[in-house]
């Protein structure tokens, strides 16, 4: 049995974090040699005998112009004798990537030569020389245990390079105040524990728990925050690579909790030590004098206020101006002394009345799940959101009282055991699992084998919202040519979204380089890996000096600033292919051009609970599933990209239980032929012409010169018809004022934000249109009490007011006070992810569509699939030269660079080894036929039975086992 989640973990500050920090500070000062070793990268280069690969070029890009300075170490479990670098492929190891945890055979500790940004010459890094010895020291053993595997890549001559990095030491300085220090995170809890895993039956398939998870949960270590309110909760996803090159995908939610009193006492003692060592007598005297003056002014103000209160009790109508003047002077002095003391905050005791009191110390805790399956991220993310909402339920808004009580009584341990042990992994297709998560239900499923893996789990919207289409094409070209790609952002959540989206756009190719969506600060040396990689890191600790320039091009993308910088020569697509891609992407994602969405990361990637409201994914909240429409879209022309395949409103407040009413959602026609009459009627209504639907969409005149404001309005003819059965959503917007009462001569209204009002025909009533996150919001007036009866605001759950707004495309209804809460996009009106995938899929079909014409032995096994010397350019059974020559005539010379990539080699290798009916091969082949047949079989066309096989689709819903705590509650009742 295999469960959805392999492990649950809780990471944060341990009770002895102050002593751990001090001991590490002393150890770092005593042993500088340990710091030099920690920044090196180990390369394991061995021949993989049973699985041969295709070698594309005689000079691999992984070896060209890369110089290594070897630091050799010998020992029983460390590394072997020093050998020439290119001789490691003579190893007799048959499974080099499946090593034991502490096996370092045929490895060498290497320090990479860093190349200057302004010069082409390489200068070696200065490291301490290390002499070989028979037994590893204590420091070496500690570093070997704390190594981090970051991935394995394939090179020429059937070599695999396994990269292992050592975390850098945490930089600490004696002059740093304890409140400003960064503390190393610790693993506070894991489930199942190591003991439980040993006692599990062999039938349970569970991966080992990595020992470096806390470092990825807190990539920039932990800081202590002092605030009156709870800091904003965040979340992010990350990927880990084990010693056998298998990937482990994690996602965690960071929740801030009040620091326990015992930890506060330890911290205050450390602050006293810091004040004694880092403050002078003069500083303390000045601080004490200012503090004494502040207390004097406060006591004086109290006495003056008491006198004023006595006069008011005596019934005196006149106000003494002298008394008022004295009160004003005291208040000004208090403000002055407080501001003077604020820079000297750390030189005072922690609790100072009026300056430091009533402020809580907050520490972060990371609650996370680990899974071997990358396409269950949406489910795990929403599961963690609901579970962690019980920790800060009092800080969230618009939770019904019944759900609030359920959250407060939620047994976290019981739900963790349920998701890790009881809830089975759903098969690909066939069924959905209904999983109980406190007061809500979530639905877990995996796409059938005849659909693109993860097409409905990978969220492409954040990448396309943050970057312009030309910048996205630069990233696509870099990934296609296997360059180095670095994502930068100030929030960790955006890094995971962008990295995963870029990999998803490469289908049917598979990324073969290193993949680290979130890189911890201590692993900054991973930038020196001499191979292709996709790495995401926080922008405020990234420096170009950390990235050596070599023969592999480098692309640095700042997701917060919509900027892409390239270093080195990246092979560009031909002008015709690039222009077609850009034109089709603009039709599929008009969010910036037609819906005025700014270029920046969306808010739901920055916060776990945007605007203190629990928002959930539509993928996990409904038992109905969006149809896989890519085969049908392949037959469409680009002009048909504006058609909507379905209408769906976002879930802005999961506690409104909209998932219990799936009939209020418009989905595309389900593939099951046994449809009910209601679903057929629903589909007929969806396919009806737009003017026949029950929602208003009057013509809209685009402003001639749109401003850069977030909200934009226009005026058009008012229609009182309101779309029914629409899904409401829970977010809010600034109050809009009536055009009749606020319209001025220039035709604009004052709403607190920039407004554009387009004049309408004389005699017609004006209606305001505003755009928020791709939603075209129209002001709706309730003409009769029966209008919108039973409808609620999608954010608050309150009844809709007499004046509210409604989205013309998805039917979202929100009261005016909650428009600013709209943080989820209007899909597919402003962004259609399936059409995005179709655009890139058509590109690959055009490039790779004729690949089978150059395969001479399609059923050849990989053991015999290799380089045939003297074969005139034949790579195994694939005629590489002929394919490149023919494709270059049509698409340009960049094809040769694509064919030299390892991703293309894997694509061809899979089709030479696997059977034609294997889903990994048949899916792309039949999508190719689908595009050639214009989406459906014709008289002389070929059928696509694999894509049309309804037996592979999701046909039923099963209820997963509920947590033990709920079973006990049901038994009591």
Swiss-Prot record:
Residues 69-79, 739-750 have a biased composition (Polar residues). Its main location: cytoplasm. It comes from the Eukaryota. Residues 588-919 form the dDENN domain. Residues 449-586 form the cDENN domain. GO terms for molecular function: diacylglycerol binding; guanyl-nucleotide exchange factor activity. PANTHER family: DENN DOMAIN-CONTAINING PROTEIN 3, DENN DOMAIN-CONTAINING PROTEIN 4. It comes from Schizosaccharomyces pombe (strain 972 / ATCC 24843) (Fission yeast). GO terms for biological process: regulation of Rab protein signal transduction; vesicle-mediated transport. GO terms for cellular component: cytoplasmic vesicle; cytosol; nucleus. It is found in: Cytoplasm; Nucleus. InterPro entries: cDENN_dom, dDENN_dom, DENN_C, DENN_Domain_GEFs, Tripartite_DENN, uDENN_dom. Keywords: Cytoplasm, Nucleus, Phosphoprotein. This is DENN domain-containing protein C297.05. Residues 69-136, 693-713, 729-750 are annotated as: Disordered. Gene3D superfamilies: 3.30.450.200, 3.40.50.11500. The lineage of its organism: Eukaryota, Fungi, Dikarya, Ascomycota, Taphrinomycotina. The modification Phosphoserine is found at residues 134, 318, 726. Residues 169-427 form the uDENN domain. The keyword Phosphoprotein applies. The keyword ATP-binding does not apply.
């Amino acid at each position: 049995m295999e469960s959805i989640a392999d492990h649950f973990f809780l990471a944060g500050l341990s009770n002895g974090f102050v002593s751990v920090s001090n001991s590490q500070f002393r150890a770092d000062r005593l042993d500088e040699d340990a710091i030099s070793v920690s920044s090196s990268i180990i390369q394991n280069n061995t021949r993989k005998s049973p699985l041969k690969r295709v070698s594309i070029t005689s000079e691999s890009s992984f070896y060209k112009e890369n110089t290594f300075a070897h630091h050799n170490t010998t020992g029983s479990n460390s590394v072997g004798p020093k050998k020439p670098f290119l001789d490691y492929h003579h190893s007799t190891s048959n499974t080099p990537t499946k090593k034991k945890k502490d096996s370092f055979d045929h490895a060498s500790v290497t320090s990479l030569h860093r190349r200057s940004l302004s010069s082409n010459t390489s200068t070696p890094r200065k490291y301490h020389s290390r002499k070989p010895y028979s037994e590893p020291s204590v420091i070496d053993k500690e570093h070997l245990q704390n190594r981090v595997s970051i991935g394995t890549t394939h090179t020429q001559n059937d070599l695999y390079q396994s990269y292992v990095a050592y975390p850098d030491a945490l930089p600490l300085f004696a002059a740093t105040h304890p409140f400003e220090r960064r503390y190393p995170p610790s693993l506070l809890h894991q489930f199942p524990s190591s003991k439980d895993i040993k006692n599990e039956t062999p039938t349970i398939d569970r991966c080992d728990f990595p020992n470096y998870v806390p470092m990825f949960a807190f990539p920039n270590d932990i800081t202590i925050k002092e605030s009156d309110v709870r800091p904003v909760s965040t979340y992010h996803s990350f990927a880990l690579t084990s010693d056998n090159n298998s990937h482990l995908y994690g996602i965690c939610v960071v929740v801030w909790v009040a620091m326990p009193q015992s930890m506060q006492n330890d911290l205050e003692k450390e602050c006293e030590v810091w004040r004694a060592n880092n403050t002078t007598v003069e500083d303390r005297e000045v601080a004490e004098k200012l503090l004494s003056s502040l207390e004097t002014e406060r006591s004086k103000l109290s006495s003056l206020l008491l006198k004023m209160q006595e006069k008011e009790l005596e019934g005196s109508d006149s106000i003494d101006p002298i008394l008022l003047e004295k009160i004003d002077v005291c208040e000004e002095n208090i403000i002055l002394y407080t501001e003077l003391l604020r820079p000297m905050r750390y030189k005072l005791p922690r609790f100072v009345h009026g300056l430091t009191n009533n402020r809580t110390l907050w520490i972060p805790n990371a609650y996370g799940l680990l899974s071997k399956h990358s396409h269950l991220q949406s489910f795990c993310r929403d599961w963690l959101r609901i579970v962690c909402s019980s920790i800060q339920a009092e800080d969230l808004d618009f939770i019904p009282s019944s759900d609030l009580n359920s959250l407060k009584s939620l047994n976290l341990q019981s739900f963790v055991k349920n998701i890790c042990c009881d809830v089975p992994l759903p098969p690909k297709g066939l069924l959905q699992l209904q999983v109980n998560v406190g007061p809500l239900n979530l639905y877990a499923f995996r796409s059938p084998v005849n659909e693109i893996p993860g097409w409905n789990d990978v969220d492409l919207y954040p990448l396309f919202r943050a970057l312009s289409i030309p910048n996205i094409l630069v990233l696509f070209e870099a990934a296609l040519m296997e360059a180095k790609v670095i994502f930068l952002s100030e929030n960790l959540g955006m890094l995971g979204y962008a990295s995963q989206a870029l990999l998803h756009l490469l289908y049917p190719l598979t990324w073969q380089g290193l993949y680290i969506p979130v890189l911890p600060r201590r692993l900054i040396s991973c930038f020196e890996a001499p191979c292709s990689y996709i790495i995401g890191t926080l922008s405020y600790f990234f420096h170009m000096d950390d990235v050596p320039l070599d023969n592999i091009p480098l692309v640095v993308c700042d997701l917060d600033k919509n900027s892409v910088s390239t270093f080195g020569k990246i092979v560009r697509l031909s002008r015709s292919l690039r222009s077609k891609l850009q034109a089709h992407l603009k039709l599929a994602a008009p969010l910036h051009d037609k819906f005025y969405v700014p270029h920046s990361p969306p808010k739901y990637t920055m916060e776990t609970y945007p605007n203190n409201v629990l928002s959930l994914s539509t993928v996990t909240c409904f038992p109905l599933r969006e149809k896989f429409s890519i085969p049908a879209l392949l037959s469409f022309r680009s002009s048909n990209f504006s058609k909507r395949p379905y209408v769906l409103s976002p879930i802005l407040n999961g506690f409104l239980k909209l998932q219990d009413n799936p009939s209020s959602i418009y989905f595309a026609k389900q593939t099951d032929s046994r449809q009910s009459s209601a679903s057929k009627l629903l589909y007929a209504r969806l396919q009806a012409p737009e003017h026949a639907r029950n929602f208003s969409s009057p013509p809209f005149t685009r402003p001639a010169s749109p401003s850069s404001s977030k909200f934009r309005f226009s005026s058009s003819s008012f229609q009182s018809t309101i779309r029914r059965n629409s899904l409401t959503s829970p977010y809010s917007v600034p109050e809009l004022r009536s055009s009749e009462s606020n319209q001025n001569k220039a035709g604009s209204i004052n709403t607190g934000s920039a407004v554009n009002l387009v004049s309408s025909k004389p005699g017609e009533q004006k209606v305001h249109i505003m755009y928020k996150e791709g939603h075209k919001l129209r002001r709706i007036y309730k003409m009769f009490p029966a209008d919108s009866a039973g409808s609620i605001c999608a954010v608050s759950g309150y009844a809709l007011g007499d004046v509210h707004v409604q989205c013309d495309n998805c039917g979202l209804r929100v009261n005016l006070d909650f428009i600013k809460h709209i943080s989820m996009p209007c899909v597919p009106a402003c962004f259609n992810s399936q059409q995005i995938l179709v655009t890139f899929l058509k590109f690959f079909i055009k490039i790779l569509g004729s690949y089978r014409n150059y395969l001479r032995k399609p059923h050849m096994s990989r053991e015999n699939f290799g380089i045939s010397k003297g074969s005139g350019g034949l790579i195994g059974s694939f005629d590489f030269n002929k394919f490149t020559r023919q494709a270059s005539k049509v698409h340009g010379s960049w094809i040769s660079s694509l064919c030299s990539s390892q991703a293309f080699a894997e694509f061809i290798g899979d089709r030479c080894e696997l059977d034609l009916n294997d889903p990994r091969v048949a899916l792309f082949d039949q999508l190719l036929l689908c595009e050639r047949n214009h989406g459906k079989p014709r008289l002389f066309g070929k059928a696509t039975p694999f894509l049309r096989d309804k037996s592979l689709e999701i046909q039923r819903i099963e209820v997963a086992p509920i947590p033990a705590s709920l079973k006990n509650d049901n038994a009591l009742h």
